[in-house]
């Protein structure tokens, strides 16, 4: 009965090299905004309806609440540490991207103080990928 069926839509081919550069640029901007203690710039990573699943806390829903949480965290931070985010795996289908990455916290001297992994789900909206869900874990032993 395949003759009666409409032909399947052909999925657009994703240029994974280009996509990796685009998503890594988002991670680099996120890290730079954290270092600058600019909560609004960090929150620009997230969609308006995003949900962020952090360590040792309940999920935070919505860009405004995420921004507020980021602002509180940045205001409390007096260590001078900064984070580096790197893509480990990237998967794309249609307008969705799943990124699995690693993060490393460095002290002002550049020494590693903590590390872990994260997963971010991006959706392309108005021609731009925004994070709709993310979560992170630490690989460091409990303090």
Q: Language model features by range: what are they?
A:
Residues 49, 57-59, 104-106, 137-139:
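Solvent-exposed loop/turn segments at secondary-structure junctions
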Residues 77-78, 105-113:
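Short, cysteine-centered beta-strand-loop-beta hairpins and adjacent loop/turn segments enriched
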Residues 17, 21-22, 39-95:
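A solvent-exposed, acidic/Ser-Thr-rich amphipathic alpha-helical stretch
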Residues 4-45, 142-143:
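Short, low-complexity N-terminal intrinsically disordered segments enriched in polar/charged residues
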Residues 94-103:
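A short hydrophobic beta-strand element
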Residues 115-142:
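Short beta-strand edge/turn micro-motifs at domain boundaries
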């Amino acid at each position: 009965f395949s003759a009666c069926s409409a032909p399947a839509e052909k999925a657009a081919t994703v240029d994974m090299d280009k996509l990796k550069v685009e998503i890594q640029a988002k991670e680099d901007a996120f890290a730079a905004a954290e270092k600058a203690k600019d909560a609004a710039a960090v929150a620009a990573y997230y969609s308006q309806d995003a949900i962020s699943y952090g360590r040792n806390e309940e999920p935070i829903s919505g860009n405004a609440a995420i921004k507020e949480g980021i602002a509180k965290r940045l205001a409390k931070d007096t260590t001078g540490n900064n984070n580096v985010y790197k893509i480990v795996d990237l998967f794309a289908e249609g307008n969705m991207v799943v990124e699995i990455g690693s993060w490393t916290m460095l002290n002002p001297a550049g020494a590693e103080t903590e590390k872990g992994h994260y997963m971010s789900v991006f959706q392309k909206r108005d021609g731009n990928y925004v994070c709709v869900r993310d979560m992170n874990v630490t690989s460091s032993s409990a303090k």
